[in-house]
Structures are given as C-alpha cells and as structure tokens.
Design a protein with these regions (language model features):
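Charged docking surfaces used in two-component/phosphorelay signaling
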Residues: 19-27
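Short hydrophobic/Thr-rich beta-strand motif most characteristic of the beta2 strand and flanking loop
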Residues: 29-36, 44
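Acidic catalytic/metal-coordinating carboxylates
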Residues: 37, 63-66
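Short amphipathic alpha-helix used as the core "switch/output" element in two-component signaling
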Residues: 43, 65-77, 191
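Active-site beta3 strand of CheY-like receiver
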Residues: 49-54
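Receiver (REC) domain active-site loop signature in two-component systems and cognate sites
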Residues: 59
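C-terminal output helix
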Residues: 108-117
Length: 217
C-alpha cells in the first residue's frame, strides 16, 4: 500500500518566501500548504495534520511565537521550525524554549532545508531507540547543514549505545578537525583505532594530520 505524501506547512507573510519554499519542498516530494499569517496557519492546522511547519517569527495578525503557543495548546505533534531574519535570533531562541525543534536564518540555504526535513522525519521515525547506524546518518544530515552541535550530540548518543564501534569516534574527530581543533580531532581518531585497529579512515586521518603514536597524549 502506497504511503500518503508527507504534508508540510509554510507560514510567512512574504509571498516570495512562501513560493520559493513551496517549490523547493514540493520538488523534494512533499505535499506543501502555505499560509500568510498565524491565524490562517492555525485554521489550517485545526483541519489538517502537518509533520513540519516552517513558521516566520514576525508576521501581522499573529506572529510565530503566538502561533507556536496555540499549536502546543492543540496538542499537535507538528514539528515547528522557526524562520528568522537577522536581529530576531533571540526571539528564535525563545521559540525553541516553547518547543520549536530548530530555527533557520534568512536567506536560506536550500540544501540545509532539505537536510533538516530529512533529519526531523528520520528522528521521528526512529523515536528514542534508534540504531547506531541511524544515529550516524542523523549526524551526517546535521553536519551537512552545518549544525555541528546537533551532529556532535547524535554521535555521543551513538557512543552511549556502543563504545566498541569506531565510526562515532571517527566522525567526532572529523567534526573537531573541521572546526580547527586538531588536537581534539586526533584524540578521537586514536579512540577510533582503539576500537578497531584496522579502521582505515582514522589511520588515514592521523597520517594526513602528521600525527604518530609518540605524540599521543
């Protein structure tokens, strides 16, 4: 039996943003509704379940924070991603405290939006008991949209599940290396080799960094 398409909602008072996000998400295979303000979005949410809603934080009639409070009052399980312009990031952080799952700053990176949708949907399918491979995939999706804090959290959760797998150590090393912390990167690459002496990616990374066993701390 064919699964119905995932429904998403885009809420923004700027027509071009609604149009561009809708086109981007529909091209990725999702069914997308749009609303120009919080009141319209709330009415749609009472009639239809949305897996994810992209909500502008600053709109006429009803802004993003007020909409988020109403959605939580409806006990809806819609994951809310806040859309914010420069200067409203502090309010986006407030929205996170109210239950928003993430926020995106304008202008948007199309790749980051697609990866975020994939990440949220995968996280929901997995629930609290996701496999290590699934957590590694979540980390990869988060890294792809430059959400390094979230990527690191997924990897550390994977380590809590199984300390003997080399991949979480390796990818933690990769994250630290991408942020310029070579010493911490090497530490995790060595931990990957401790878990599996034949794990070639970690050995190659240490060779690339110019580290040898005598430098291990």
């Amino acid at each position: 039996m064919t699964q119905p398409p995932v429904r998403l909602l885009v809420v923004d008072d700027e027509r071009n943003i609604r149009k561009n996000l809708r086109m981007l998400l529909e091209a990725a295979g999702y069914q997308v509704d749009v609303a120009s303000d919080g009141e319209e979005a709330l009415a749609k949410s009472r009639e239809q379940h949305y897996e994810i809603a992209f909500v502008d934080i600053q709109m006429p009639k009803m802004g993003g924070l007020e909409l988020l409070r109403y959605l939580r009052g409806l006990s809806t399980k819609t994951a809310v991603v806040i859309l914010t312009a420069h200067g409203t990031v502090a309010r986006a952080v407030e929205a996170m405290k109210l239950g928003a799952v993430d926020f995106l700053e304008k202008p948007f990176d199309p790749k980051a939006i697609r990866l975020l949708v994939d990440e949220i949907l995968l996280r929901r399918r997995l629930g609290p008991g996701g496999s290590i491979d699934a957590l590694l995939h979540l980390a990869e999706l988060a890294w792809g949209r430059k959400a390094y804090v979230e990527a690191r959290a997924y990897l550390k959760t994977a380590l809590l599940r199984d300390l003997t797998r080399p991949e979480p150590y390796y990818w933690l090393g990769f994250l630290y290396e991408s942020e310029g912390d070579v010493r911490q990167a090497a530490h995790y690459y060595y931990l990957a080799l401790d878990a599996n002496q034949t794990f070639r990616p970690a050995r190659d990374a240490l060779t690339r960094l110019g580290w040898i066993d005598s430098k291990r701390s």
